[in-house]
Amino acid sequence: MVQITEVNESKAGTANRTAAHTHIKGLGLDDTGAARQVEGGFVGQVEAREACGVIVDLIKAKKMSGRAILLAGGPSTGKTALALAISQELGPKVPFCPLVGSELYSVEVKKTETLMENFRRAIGLRIKETKEVYEGEVTELTPEDAENPLGGYGKTISHVIVGLKSAKGTKTLRLDPTIYDSIQKEKVSIGDVIYIEANTGAVKRVGRSDAYATEFDLEAEEYVPLPKGEVHKKKEIVQDVTLHDLDIANARPQGGQDVISMMGQLMKPKKTEITEKLRFEVNKVVAKYVDQGVAELIPGVLFIDEANMLDIEIFTYLNKALESDIAPIVVLASNRGMTTVRGTEDVISPHGIPADLIDRLLIVRTLPYNKDEIRLIIERRSAVENLALEDGALDILADMATHTSLRYALQLLSPAGILSSTAGRQKITIDDINEAKMLFIDAKRSTKILENSDRYM
């Protein structure tokens, strides 16, 4: 007998993954732009959040492009969280390009080139195009053939007759034979809802008409209603691209589909460096589209974390790039005080950034959290991770975060949760926290052990 067993659906695939900033939903401001004490995943940092709220308003009003902001504060004070909240407030339509200072260094490509690539990634272009389309349910699909002009017994398709039906009428179209190939590729049959672009002849199958929903088919079909209005209509199509997408499209022309072309592409794994001339040409085309009203430029946000890792050459290039006609809003974050600028030997500057660039920055300061705020953060974070804490355990974690770091206290939550469930408890207790603390030491204790030990090389 053949053994057949049912596979139970696993819930593991649908479980949400918890990242460091999963709980951040926005800046948590009210209608007047004032920050609430606890809102949007944030606790405290009222002045910094209000400052970021003003920046968001300026970005939306398109009055902020080509300027730079510095988020300055100690470790674990929410600098990255603020940058993420800015992107959440701006929404998915505004480009947000995050990177770390060390990402700009590469053996293959110049660091200034990598910076410019990310600059262009953070600038969006919204292209609005009005297209004439024929849309409806296919009622007739008849290819008409003619004698082969080259002679012989074969026949060629001279044109295709397609009948389309919409809510307001029907139309019969005579189409070019090249469109018949597109119809075959989309596997269009009578009863399907399609649209055909008048200018390009592109065919798109939308789905099966819901009039055929009672049919029994082995394949799962997507049933769509009969299109409203006339068969022939004008449709506005909005496309969002970045300037980097346009650069790449022009820098890497597609080769042929033959084996030699494909092998040639495989043999070139090196990154293509986009020239200034190409970018200038792309900018000219973009400017023409903007003047015609076809496209709209959307300056986004380029977030560079650990800005103190950038060197003097990148900072010099950044000064020039910020003054260009097309520039995004640059948000830098640094947790350093007075430190040497990388790439120099004796230039000591605030946050590791040269004085001439510091002068161009709007600086937003983040302050260390007090014990009550830390307690609230741990409580909220434990709720995100679906962990229940006893009040005593919460107090111990808050104390620990005050003396060590907030990150260390938050990182102990998951191990303490596992220890608690292993012991058969529903809530994390003080014992679980102490056991996790014994198993995983913090940076200060590790330093003390190394100072008092001679057993290390």
Curated annotation (Swiss-Prot):
InterPro entries given in the database record: AAA+_ATPase (IPR003593), P-loop_NTPase (IPR027417), RuvB-like (IPR027238), RuvB-like_C (IPR041048), RuvBL1/2_DNA/RNA_bd_dom (IPR042487), TIP49_P-loop (IPR010339)
In this chain, ATP is annotated as bound at 73-80
* Catalysed conversion reaction: ATP + H2O = ADP + phosphate + H(+)
GO CC annotation: Ino80 complex; R2TP complex; Swr1 complex
A Gene Ontology biological process term: box C/D snoRNP assembly
User: Which top class of enzyme applies to this chain?
Assistant: hydrolase
Query: What Enzyme Commission number does this protein have?
Result: 3.6.4.12
The GO terms describing molecular function are:
3'-5' DNA helicase activity; 5'-3' DNA helicase activity; ATP binding; ATP hydrolysis activity
Complex and partners: May form heterododecamers with RVB2. Component of the SWR1 chromatin remodeling complex, the INO80 chromatin remodeling complex, and of the R2TP complex.
What's the stated role of this polypeptide?
Answer: DNA helicase which participates in several chromatin remodeling complexes, including the SWR1 and the INO80 complexes. The SWR1 complex mediates the ATP-dependent exchange of histone H2A for the H2A variant HZT1 leading to transcriptional regulation of selected genes by chromatin remodeling. The INO80 complex remodels chromatin by shifting nucleosomes and is involved in DNA repair. Also involved in pre-rRNA processing.
Q: What is this protein called?
A: RuvB-like helicase 1
Q: Which organism is it from?
A: Candida glabrata (strain ATCC 2001 / BCRC 20586 / JCM 3761 / NBRC 0622 / NRRL Y-65 / CBS 138)
